[in-house]
């Protein structure tokens, strides 16, 4: 009874060479129709699955390998005499090596196929054989990745068989492969069927490794970046293209995500500068260069080594301005050719990053890892519920423009946060303080440090004011209008303080905590 290898692959990469090497090593090659045809065309002696089972492929190939003579050969425990006796009685022979990859479900979805074609590309027999082989890895070598053909052949040539360690590694890879495959299917069908089940009792999320990163948040931490195969239509920082410069770091990805999410809030030409996941300068202007210079002037100290994001293509004037200080990453929908050439010549290590689907919204929910589990929530894509003026004085049109600008910015600042703004540019940003009044003081100190006048500015707070103290302080710095969610039990006291100081106040009815 010679050794047998079952090969049934949709991805034919390297399969002919693999089968030829197995044939040289004395393996009988068993294959299903499509793969068998390719192997036969290349001079390989193949036994078709239907010849083993005595049963033809039916229903257009839907049923071909789901048969006891296949699965018995895969699942037989070779050191169990009773199992082997049953195998012999049923005329079943063990299968030693299995090479399978599955119907191209993901690729079918990406090409825009209709639902019938998508469902037809859900593999049934393939995963069954993969799982059976992986379960019986003590005796069976399962290969789901063409990249592993070479190492298996080398080991067979050197040792005559694969080691248990190799079979375990390949079995684990196989189980991951089928789990990934099924999670892609469930994610896609959830969307295609239009079933609004936001938080199902059980779910899995597929991710595919894109790159191993140099390290994680700190040098002693290892890290990698993964992409979602089912969120391919939406904005994707994970699949961003580094057009020039060093590879992206873990922290670069986090900062780019923060910068892109904020700059996309604006329809007008805008620039955002981010440092350690918080904006340090944001501005709107008529050109990308002017927006950048305005944003930079708000906190040039923090901007050093920062990430700069635009919502317009980078032109040559902007490129020249960007080379004046050290920056880590420039993010934009695109780069004009002369701007790109200038930046690549002047800054060899500066990362120039083009975001995939910049004009689209990010897909999927927001996940946060906690010990022993995960938190899942909707993305914070809304801006406000209703704009309601709650004070005696209404904001002027210009103040309202600045209030809405500041509100968009504060939504993306770590809580507790306060943003002071004027003329569609930040004046001071107070992020991540444990009290709201401290956030205000931090924002004011930043403004004072860079000689930015707070007189006539506006203030945004991402959550309500628990006391009137922040409003009293804001008045001392010449702030003329405030935007906040409202909802405090002391709202009346806060509104009274605003009225006393002649400050216009707008409630949004929506909080934007960010942790």
From Swiss-Prot:
Membrane spanning stretches: none
Pathway terms, separated by semicolons: Purine metabolism; IMP biosynthesis via de novo pathway; 5-formamido-1-(5-phospho-D-ribosyl)imidazole-4-carboxamide from 5-amino-1-(5-phospho-D-ribosyl)imidazole-4-carboxamide (10-formyl THF route): step 1/1; Purine metabolism; IMP biosynthesis via de novo pathway; IMP from 5-formamido-1-(5-phospho-D-ribosyl)imidazole-4-carboxamide: step 1/1
Enzyme Commission designation: 2.1.2.3, 3.5.4.10
GO CC, any one term: cytosol
SMART domains reported in the protein's UniProt record: AICARFT_IMPCHas (SM00798), MGS (SM00851)
SUPFAM superfamilies, A to Z: Cytidine deaminase-like, Methylglyoxal synthase-like
KW Ion transport (keyword) present: no
Biological process annotations from GO: 'de novo' IMP biosynthetic process
Catalytic reaction list: (6R)-10-formyltetrahydrofolate + 5-amino-1-(5-phospho-beta-D-ribosyl)imidazole-4-carboxamide = 5-formamido-1-(5-phospho-D-ribosyl)imidazole-4-carboxamide + (6S)-5,6,7,8-tetrahydrofolate; IMP + H2O = 5-formamido-1-(5-phospho-D-ribosyl)imidazole-4-carboxamide
Listed InterPro entries: AICAR_Tfase_dup_dom_sf (IPR024051), Cytidine_deaminase-like (IPR016193), MGS-like_dom (IPR011607), MGS-like_dom_sf (IPR036914), PurH-like (IPR002695)
GO molecular function: IMP cyclohydrolase activity; phosphoribosylaminoimidazolecarboxamide formyltransferase activity
Domain MGS-like: 1-144
UniProt domain comment: The IMP cyclohydrolase activity resides in the N-terminal region.
UniProt cross-references to PANTHER family, sorted A to Z: BIFUNCTIONAL PURINE BIOSYNTHESIS PROTEIN ATIC (PTHR11692:SF0), BIFUNCTIONAL PURINE BIOSYNTHESIS PROTEIN PURH (PTHR11692)
Family indicated by similarity: Belongs to the PurH family.
Name of the molecule in the record: Bifunctional purine biosynthesis protein PurH
Organism: Persephonella marina (strain DSM 14350 / EX-H1)
